[in-house]
Amino acid sequence: LPPMAQGKDKACFAVTEPNTGLNTTQLKTRAVRKGDRYVVNGQKVWISTAQVANKILLLARTTPLDEVKRPTEGLSLFYTDFDRSRITVREIDKMGRKIVDSNELFFVDFEVPVDDRIGEEGKGFEYILHGMNPERVLIAAEAVGLGKLALSRATAYAKDRVVFNRPIGQNQAIQHPLAENWMELEAAWLMVLSAASQYDKGLPCGAAANAAKYLAGEAGYKACQQAVMTHGG
């Protein structure tokens, strides 16, 4: 952690895969132990900051799904060097959120020392759960912030854009969708605050964190979409 806090190390978090999404137990990326190392092969997607990372926090399956009693078992977590000779990084072009790069990662015989495994083998899913709920709250807060920024730009444009001798913002067809966006963003923000409060108090917050992420994502997306349409007026 000290090198991360000092800015000497930059890390990316690699969990999501093309065909699994939130169904983390179905990850296909394999880490096969060979002596004092694991050999990793597979693919990840929507991985942030991989363009600049020199470290990677990686979740991979070390025991095949058909060999475990529960699907949450057999996943292991690693924190290791980002070897670009074994990891191909392909950036995903996005319409927004350009400040953070999003990427596809392709692992071909990527070697990870056993010492770079976090905790016990097969307990990775259990470990990441401790960080997933606060991450969901943070993502939800980000979505609300993006939506509010889009809304502020849309309303400013609606006040300045003059058509037929008056600002387009004086038309109810422009006003009502933006007002609806504002209400949805405010409601999502209250859900974010509720989830964050539950987490800070040490209470179970899984449902609230997921609800906040969903509501904020929907509200943020709709606000951005409406902002684009407003600028077309």
Report residues per predicted region:
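Flexible, small-/acidic-enriched active-site or ligand-binding loops
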Residues: Q26, D83-P113
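A short, Trp-centered hydrophobic/proline-enriched beta-strand micro-motif
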Residues: G7-V15, L59
